Amino acid sequence: GRDGYIAQPENCVYHCFPGSSGCDTLCKEKGATSGHCGFLPGSGVACWCDNLPNKVPIVVGGEKCH
């Protein structure tokens, strides 16, 4: 697995509320060990996942969300 900001189609982040459990739930549903609400410059608050399966897309730096 890998760590990163989990991506929606088109390289968009999943927005979140700092301190909420939403990202942890989302990441675990996708097969990660855990997740939390982080901050991605240029995108704002975004879900970060730890040990996400390689088949699940993560945000690619420099690519704009379409």
Curated annotation (Swiss-Prot):
<dbReference type="GO" id="GO:0090729">
    <property type="term" value="F:toxin activity"/>
</dbReference>
<keyword id="KW-0800">Toxin</keyword>
<keyword id="KW-0528">Neurotoxin</keyword>
<dbReference type="GO" id="GO:0006952">
    <property type="term" value="P:defense response"/>
</dbReference>
<keyword id="KW-0964">Secreted</keyword>
<keyword id="KW-0738">Voltage-gated sodium channel impairing toxin</keyword>
<comment type="similarity">
    <text>Belongs to the long (4 C-C) scorpion toxin superfamily. Sodium channel inhibitor family. Alpha subfamily.</text>
</comment>
<protein>
    <recommendedName>
        <fullName>Alpha-like toxin Bom3</fullName>
    </recommendedName>
</protein>
<feature type="disulfide bond">
    <location>
        <begin position="27"/>
        <end position="49"/>
    </location>
</feature>
<keyword id="KW-1015">Disulfide bond</keyword>
<feature type="disulfide bond">
    <location>
        <begin position="16"/>
        <end position="37"/>
    </location>
</feature>
<dbReference type="InterPro" id="IPR003614">
    <property type="entry name" value="Scorpion_toxin-like"/>
</dbReference>
<dbReference type="InterPro" id="IPR002061">
    <property type="entry name" value="Scorpion_toxinL/defensin"/>
</dbReference>
<dbReference type="InterPro" id="IPR044062">
    <property type="entry name" value="LCN-type_CS_alpha_beta_dom"/>
</dbReference>
<comment type="function">
    <text>Alpha toxins bind voltage-independently at site-3 of sodium channels (Nav) and inhibit the inactivation of the activated channels, thereby blocking neuronal transmission. As it competes neither with the classical alpha-toxin AaH2 nor the beta-toxin Css2, this toxin is an alpha-like toxin.</text>
</comment>
<keyword id="KW-0872">Ion channel impairing toxin</keyword>
<feature type="disulfide bond">
    <location>
        <begin position="12"/>
        <end position="65"/>
    </location>
</feature>
<dbReference type="Pfam" id="PF00537">
    <property type="entry name" value="Toxin_3"/>
</dbReference>
<dbReference type="InterPro" id="IPR036574">
    <property type="entry name" value="Scorpion_toxin-like_sf"/>
</dbReference>
<feature type="domain" description="LCN-type CS-alpha/beta">
    <location>
        <begin position="2"/>
        <end position="66"/>
    </location>
</feature>
<feature type="disulfide bond">
    <location>
        <begin position="23"/>
        <end position="47"/>
    </location>
</feature>
<dbReference type="InterPro" id="IPR018218">
    <property type="entry name" value="Scorpion_toxinL"/>
</dbReference>
<dbReference type="GO" id="GO:0005576">
    <property type="term" value="C:extracellular region"/>
</dbReference>
<dbReference type="GO" id="GO:0019871">
    <property type="term" value="F:sodium channel inhibitor activity"/>
</dbReference>
